[in-house]
From Swiss-Prot:
Cited Pfam families: Prefoldin_2
Stated family: Belongs to the prefoldin subunit beta family.
Name of the molecule in the record: Prefoldin subunit beta
Gene Ontology MF, one: protein-folding chaperone binding
InterPro entries: PFD_beta-like, PfdB, Prefoldin
Predominant location category: cytoplasm
GO BP of this protein: chaperone-mediated protein complex assembly; protein folding
Location(s), subcellular: Cytoplasm
Biological function: Molecular chaperone capable of stabilizing a range of proteins. Seems to fulfill an ATP-independent, HSP70-like function in archaeal de novo protein folding.
UniProt KW keywords: Chaperone, Cytoplasm
GO cellular component, one term: cytoplasm
Subunit and interaction comment: Heterohexamer of two alpha and four beta subunits.
Length: 123
């Protein structure tokens, strides 16, 4: 006969699994933002070498729109700023989730090693 886990242990394990999935999503999103940031920085570096009156075009939907170098650089710097802010938030979320996962993992170990009897509550 298979013994069921105590409700407290089941609840903590369920929370642990949900947090792991959330962490996975945050890490994927962070990787996407980092790639976008690297691309923006690469384009900005390429634009540095162009003359101020260079003809540049920006894809808007399915249409190429002529823009000045200054407008493109301004747009890219704004995008870079937005991505850096988003990256900062994602790193903070990642750190928080990792700490929370470690805490719950430690509680689960303690509950399982102690037979889940008299375990502390407060997750």
């Amino acid at each position: 006969m298979v013994e069921r886990l105590p409700p407290e242990v089941e609840a903590k394990y369920t929370k642990y699994l949900k947090l792991r999935e959330t962490l996975s999503v945050v890490m994927r999103e962070k990787a996407t933002v980092e790639a976008g940031l690297a691309e923006v920085e690469s384009v900005l570096k390429e634009l540095e070498g162009l003359p101020e009156d260079a003809e540049l075009y920006r894809l808007t939907g399915f249409v190429l729109v002529k823009k000045s170098k200054n407008e493109v650089v301004e747009d890219l710097n704004k995008r870079k700023e937005d991505l850096e802010l988003k990256l900062k938030v994602l790193k903070s979320q990642e750190e928080h989730l990792k700490k929370e996962l470690e805490r719950i993992e430690s509680e689960l170990r303690r509950l399982l090693q102690g037979g889940a009897v008299g375990g502390a509550k407060g997750a």
